Regions:
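Active-site-adjacent helix-turn-beta-strand microarchitecture at beta-sheet edges
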Residues: 1-28, 125-126
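Short, well-ordered strand-loop elements centered on a beta-strand within folded domains, enriched
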Residues: 1-9, 161-173, 303, 384
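Glycine-rich phosphate/diphosphate-binding loops and the adjacent beta-loop-alpha structural elements
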Residues: 24-53
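Short secondary-structure junctions
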Residues: 34, 39, 226-228, 319-323
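Generic detector of short, aliphatic-rich beta-strand segments that form the cores of beta-sheets
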Residues: 37-41, 45-48, 234-237, 331-335
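Second-shell loop/turn segments in exported
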Residues: 45-52, 102-105, 200-205, 294-301, ...
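Feature captures C-terminal
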Residues: 54, 58-277
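Primary recognition of N-terminal secretory signal peptides and signal-anchoring hydrophobic helices
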Residues: 274-385
Length: 385
């Protein structure tokens, strides 16, 4: 990226304009929220706003339907952490739940087109597999493509593959049939994308004169304080997250305490419970009388392979401490030196294909002397035995 010119920032005219802009966004109280609009995430890194209906999405949807007069509208949670917190609301708070200055369009769609659009949006989730204890997301489809629909009732069956998930869609209490016609409201960006992908065929019938942001400001002025409201018009089906299973609770605690990486793009699964637990407190440091955690697995040669940075972190303060870094295109180890890098969460799963790899020889610099050691590369880290 391009670094901002600090000298330009310090020019009196530029600095004054910046300060006035920030003050305008943050200091003008537009209204109030009577309570938080988003539920607390059960699992760190898994946004509740993308796995259940929430007041943020329903607020934006209500505003879009009221301004457009459409039958159905679509809303994405542009940022996973977007929320309206209880208390004063300013421009910055409203811009946080709607990042862009979009305007709205309406277009006529058939029931078949509507369901195709909903399937397109539902591809933002991964398919649920037996043993998965969380919902996860398709890393190829970012959150701003993950639309939720207001004006319809529907279910998303995540046990099915993408393209076959939308079920039991109703409009005004009746099943949505392929030959029905609806007026759909979307923002200008989404309309263009849907047209380009051939999901909808109709032409724009109406365009708003105000941006969605301006609509939200006006709505707040008329509904102060804002009350979080959720109509629960959609839900995820086809999954059994085993919420009463104590093993699930253990895995989630590891995520929430930072010892296990977030299962955002790959669900935790009870089938790998023993494997994951086998990496927790699996390193004993005798002279410190402590245990540590290192990502590890047993390789095809029967030897245990450990992520080197985890070992370096664990051995800090012991007689065997060492630092590990990347220098001159190779792993560099400095003995009798404290590790100065970060602690990485454990991987959710080390695939069998990685564990079955034949180790490759790599060059490691130890106190400036190059040696050759067998190693396996996974997710940007070397595992050594």
């Amino acid at each position: 990226g391009i670094e901002p010119d600090q000298g330009l920032r310090e020019l009196p005219a530029v600095k004054s304009a910046q300060e006035k802009t920030v003050s305008f966004i943050q200091d003008n109280v537009l209204g109030h929220a009577s309570a938080d609009f988003q539920p607390v995430d059960e699992i760190k890194g898994i946004p509740s706003g993308r796995i259940e209906d929430t007041a943020v999405i329903d607020l934006i949807g209500t505003v879009q339907l009221e301004n457009s007069g459409a039958d159905v509208t679509a809303v994405a949670l542009f940022k996973d952490t977007s929320d309206l917190k209880k208390g004063d609301l300013n421009y910055g708070n409203l811009f946080d739940i709607y990042k862009y200055p979009n305007v709205l369009y309406t277009v006529k769609v058939s029931g078949a087109e509507m369901k195709a659009y909903m399937e397109w949006a539902a591809a933002c989730w991964n398919q649920w597999k037996e043993g998965d204890v969380s919902i996860s997301f398709n890393p190829q489809k970012p959150g701003y493509l993950h639309d939720h629909f207001i004006g319809l009732n529907y279910e998303v069956n995540l046990s099915k593959p993408a393209g076959e998930r939308i079920e039991n869609v109703t409009f005004q209490g009746k099943p949505l049939t392929d030959d029905m016609t609806l007026t759909l409201c979307v923002n200008d960006y989404r309309y263009t994308g849907l047209k380009n992908e051939g999901i909808i065929s109709g032409e724009k019938e109406w365009e708003s004169s105000a941006s969605v942001r301006d609509m939200l400001v006006a709505y707040l002025a008329e509904h102060d304080p804002l009350e979080p409201a959720v109509d629960h018009n959609w839900k995820i089906t086809g999954v059994d997250l085993q919420k009463d299973n104590p093993d699930r609770a253990t895995l989630i605690e590891l995520v929430n305490t930072g010892r296990l990486e977030s299962p955002y793009s790959q669900s935790l699964n009870l089938d790998t419970y023993s494997e994951v637990l086998g990496m927790v407190d699996n390193v004993k440091v005798s002279d410190l009388d402590k245990t540590g955690t290192a990502a590890s697995f047993v390789g095809a040669d029967g030897a245990p392979y450990f992520r080197m940075r985890d070992l370096a972190y664990t051995f800090n303060g012991s007689k065997n401490q060492f630092n590990v870094s990347w220098a001159d295109g190779k792993v560099a180890i400095t003995t009798s030196t404290a590790y100065d890098g970060e602690l990485f969460p454990l991987p959710v799963r080390i695939p069998a294909a990685v564990q079955e790899q034949i180790p490759a020889d790599i060059t490691v610099s130890v106190d400036g002397t190059d040696i050759t050691v067998p190693a396996i590369l996974f997710d940007g880290h070397y595992y050594l035995t």
